[in-house]
Amino acid sequence: MISVATAECFTHGKIGIKIHKMACGYRELEKDPNYGIINGNVFVMASMFLPSKKGIESILNVKLPEPDYVFKYSKAYTQENDILVAKMVANALKNKLKCNIAISSTAGVGKGAVCILTDNNEYVFTSDVYGDLIKGENILKRQTNGLNKSFDTFVEILKKEYGLK
């Protein structure tokens, strides 16, 4: 069984929840074309929604850079720093839980960033939707796109690296 853990911000823990539902055999997802790839092959160790810098640092024992923008209690970075932070969080999560695959997401101003870290490779990508957390622009569109792109990438990794079909 392939172990997975997520520490998510702009995807609100939805990547991990979707993987968990398929892994556990939720009937409403049985018709999904990727159900058979995940069910019986993957389990979720943890799926966390971590919007704050303090929460991430406390739980994962990692020191993140100071946010580029002030936004209530949540962290908000530039596109460049979102990529850096996504990598840092995925590495900290993988080190902490010793899972096979660690997934992290973060988004401030820009397209956000997702890092999927496996035992062999690091995959870093953005959503296809520009959003601005500070101004509240395109937040839900970016989230939906990031969730779908992350899940599709996760499935492709299972096929490519783990030979699942």
From Swiss-Prot:
Transmembrane segments: none annotated. It holds the Pfam family HcgF. InterPro entries: HcgF (IPR009625). Belongs to the UPF0254 family. This is UPF0254 protein MmarC5_0742.
